[in-house]
């Protein structure tokens, strides 16, 4: 399941992020890549242990947890501290799959990577190329979103970033461990939640059928959640 979520950050927040990031020091993006990924990764990133990445990352996490669409789709248990990258002309990231487990040396956090996230911080017309191409159960999907929007997709997906041929692609990227390990179960819960919200808008939150379906939703999470 690949899910696009709009306006996680406002345009003003994106502009502020970009001002701060433009003034920071960047390093080779291969510093955080696994052995296989490092062979196909060509970009730059903010040092993960630097103050800029940590402060901006904390703001991203707060925005995520305040976004009902994100929480519904991800059912997050642990969110890895967000990282930040940029792709200039000629930069790309070849086909790869993300590491199954990620560890943060600063906090000691270790997570199973159930979902990968890209939060776009550059408008599509700022650069050519730079599309995220992901292969999942539904085939190959190509994503290039407005600044402030994010895409959420299974970390088990083969994916790549196409070469940037003009301008600069800027983004935050990170992983999360969901309370619900199974992507199929998570997709069912997400679809059910969407149906409940639609019925609640039409019938009211206190309608008997809405209440009954909400109970089914919570019981499914109770059945599948690992906390």
UniProtKB/Swiss-Prot annotation:
It comes from the Bacteria. The keyword Lipid metabolism does not apply. Disulfide bonds: none annotated. GO terms for molecular function: 2-oxoglutarate-dependent dioxygenase activity; iron ion binding; L-ascorbic acid binding. SUPFAM superfamilies: Clavaminate synthase-like (SSF51197). Residues 78-178 form the Fe2OG dioxygenase domain. The keyword Iron applies. It is an enzyme of class 1 (oxidoreductase). Fe cation binds at residues 96, 98, 159. Binds 1 Fe(2+) ion per subunit. Its cofactor is Fe(2+); L-ascorbate. This is PKHD-type hydroxylase M446_1130. It comes from Methylobacterium sp. (strain 4-46). The lineage of its organism: Bacteria, Pseudomonadati, Pseudomonadota, Alphaproteobacteria, Hyphomicrobiales.
